[in-house]
């Protein structure tokens, strides 16, 4: 009996150890000297240790015969304490060494630059994001197969992989009473990524239920689980959190349990500069990568099978361009020989965010977050008829304008994308905007235009990869509907903040406050928004997965066209935006592509 008690005590104490003690082993295992891998050969090299990179590395190395090297510019950060682990500290990490903070070009909409927040460390942006766990509309994912020809990329398959990644925690009675709704059939329970209600232990604010009451008066559904393929309505939602409320980031979940595998190595503090290509045959082949920290200190490491780019939608396309894979018009002026001519870096689609914030009465105090995924008609309200007229008459003009600005390469192909978006809006009633409510001391709405029609680009500006000189231009609001949509959604947030049951807790507006008349019309909002918004940090599309003739860079197995042994496996490849937070889809992508890689590996044995 005494032995049993002692054993139980030891187990309990071990479980209670702070994460920074439990993670000492992983930090000691990380390689920091590039000479440890320089000149070596492994089966697979992964450029980038973020969400998709670490998920794929963990999946591939389940086979002890497969060796994987992950190269990451940052370090292990999951044990940094509340600034990383506490989702309620969202934003505090911005501007630190864990934030790449990529700067855009000077934006035409306001003659200012903006910062793109992106995680620099093992786990990537799962270290710094808000942790929201929702899924897009079924029609959006289905279109990847039906419109873009990506066989196997449909809702049923992608949702199955997303559930495979998930370890869901159902809300308790208190959380359900506060506004959570849970459909067990829409969640996985045996996966790796912990997802469940955010709960500080404080009472929940009644403002969430007040919002639900206010939108129900408008015919908007409220008992919604945003994981089921139709995110329209108002509800609370899961976050990527353990039950003890510690962030469930990609390094904690995919690397920490697996770092002791002898076939998995992780090199930190190094940048992948370019892919090494062999051109002995008719088709170039990726045989490794060059990596380093600056031009005078680079190394090569070699891949027996494949190189997998997972550096994110801002950086993976630049690695391709530095490698000679991209548009001749971009590469040749920099003195880079074009090995494969592809529209790399185009089709960049990021969302925008503006804020409406109000003071609340003491009766409204408490924790709580909820989202209103609003349809096109709900977003535009009385302006809906005119907005639909734009959709029905302007698509071809918008495509021509986007191509002329360098955001895409072909008007006909872009028109197919626009018609797809119109189909979502008109025939499937997908969510067009998101009003994200946080009740932490205020009633604050972050408001997103979810489906931008504008197209931007990212391109290198120098042939030296280690200078990190590239132009990132999302071209925010250069499409008239995008500006109108962001303006209308933000106007809607102001309206709902002081409507119906919400009025009970309204104690005056602080943002926009006096910066915009309370009775401002939509035209006034379109003048206000360009100077009072931020990027949403959800850029996709820069190495789009679609047919070459439509502007694709990779095929439906994420293989780069015209190159053997090279894939892009990150947020660069979705060909469209989504009415969702993107993590659920990115985890599904990583697992689905991993299976494709493993199938190819098995066929070679």
Swiss-Prot record:
It comes from the Eukaryota. Gene3D superfamilies: FAD/NAD(P)-binding domain, Glucose Oxidase, domain 2, Glucose Oxidase, domain 3. Optimum temperature is 37 degrees Celsius. Residues 1-16 form the signal peptide. The active site is at 538 (proton acceptor). Keywords: Cell wall, Cytoplasm, Disulfide bond, Extracellular matrix, FAD, Flavoprotein, Glycoprotein, Oxidoreductase, Secreted, Signal. GO terms for cellular component: cytoplasm; extracellular region. GO terms for biological process: secondary metabolite biosynthetic process. This is Glucose oxidase. The gene is gox.
């Amino acid at each position: 009996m005494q032995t049993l008690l002692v054993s139980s005590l030891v187990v309990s104490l071990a479980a209670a150890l702070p994460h920074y003690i439990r993670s000492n082993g992983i930090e000691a295992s990380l390689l920091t000297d590039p000479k440890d891998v320089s000149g070596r050969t492994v089966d697979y090299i992964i450029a980038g240790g973020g969400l998709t990179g670490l998920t794929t590395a963990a999946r591939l190395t389940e086979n002890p015969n497969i060796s994987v090297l992950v190269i990451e510019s940052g370090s292990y950060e999951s044990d940094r304490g509340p600034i990383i682990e506490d989702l309620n500290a969202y934003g505090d990490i911005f501007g630190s060494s864990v934030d790449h903070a990529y700067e855009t070009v000077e934006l035409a909409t306001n003659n200012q630059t903006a910062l793109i927040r992106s995680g620099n460390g093992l786990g990537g942006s799962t270290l710094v994001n808000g942790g929201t766990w929702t899924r897009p509309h079924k029609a959006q994912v289905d279109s990847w197969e039906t419109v873009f020809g990506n066989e196997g990329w449909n809702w049923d398959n992608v949702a199955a992989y997303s559930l495979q990644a998930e370890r869901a925690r159902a809300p308790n009675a208190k959380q359900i009473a506060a506004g959570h709704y849970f459909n067990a059939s829409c969640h996985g329970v045996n996966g790796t990524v912990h997802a469940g209600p955010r709960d500080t232990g404080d009472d929940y604010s009644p403002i969430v239920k007040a919002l639900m009451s206010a939108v129900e008066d408008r015919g908007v559904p409220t008992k919604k689980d945003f994981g089921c393929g139709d995110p329209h309505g108002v509800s609370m939602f899961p976050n990527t959190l353990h039950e003890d409320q510690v962030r469930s980031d990609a390094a904690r979940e995919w690397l920490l349990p697996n770092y002791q595998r002898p076939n998995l190595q992780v090199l930190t503090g190094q940048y992948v500069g370019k892919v090494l290509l062999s051109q002995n045959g008719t088709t170039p082949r990726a045989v490794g990568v060059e990596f380093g920290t600056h031009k005078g200190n680079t190394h090569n490491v070699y891949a027996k099978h494949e190189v997998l780019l997972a550096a994110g939608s801002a950086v993976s396309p630049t690695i391709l361009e530095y490698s000679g894979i991209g548009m001749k018009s971009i590469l040749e002026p920099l003195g880079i020989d074009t090995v494969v001519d592809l529209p790399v870096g185009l089709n960049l689609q990021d969302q925008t965010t503006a804020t409406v914030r109000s003071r609340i009465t003491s009766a409204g105090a408490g924790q709580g977050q909820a989202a209103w995924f609003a349809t096109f008609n709900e977003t535009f309200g009385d302006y809906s008829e005119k907005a639909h007229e734009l959709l029905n008459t302007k698509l071809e003009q918008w495509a021509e304008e986007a191509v002329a600005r360098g955001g895409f390469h072909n008007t006909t192909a872009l028109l197919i994308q626009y018609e797809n978006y119109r189909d979502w809006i008109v025939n499937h009633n997908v969510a067009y905007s998101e009003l994200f409510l946080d009740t932490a001391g205020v009633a604050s709405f972050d408001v997103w235009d979810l489906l931008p029609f504008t197209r931007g680009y990212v391109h290198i500006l120098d042939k030296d990869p280690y200078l990190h000189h590239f132009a990132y231009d999302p071209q925010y609001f250069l499409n008239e509907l995008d500006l109108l949509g962001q303006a209308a959604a933000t106007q809607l947030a102001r309206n709902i903040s002081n409507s119906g049951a919400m009025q009970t807790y309204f104690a005056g507006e602080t943002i926009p406050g006096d910066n915009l008349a309370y009775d401002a019309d939509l035209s006034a909002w379109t003048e206000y928004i360009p100077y009072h918004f931020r990027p949403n940090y959800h850029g996709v599309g820069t190495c789009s997965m679609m047919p070459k003739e439509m502007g694709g860079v990779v095929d439906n197995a994420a293989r780069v066209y015209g190159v053997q042994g090279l894939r892009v496996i990150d947020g660069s490849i979705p060909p469209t935006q989504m009415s969702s937070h993107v993590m659920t889809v990115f985890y599904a992508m990583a697992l689905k592509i991993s299976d494709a890689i493993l199938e190819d590996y098995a066929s070679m044995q």
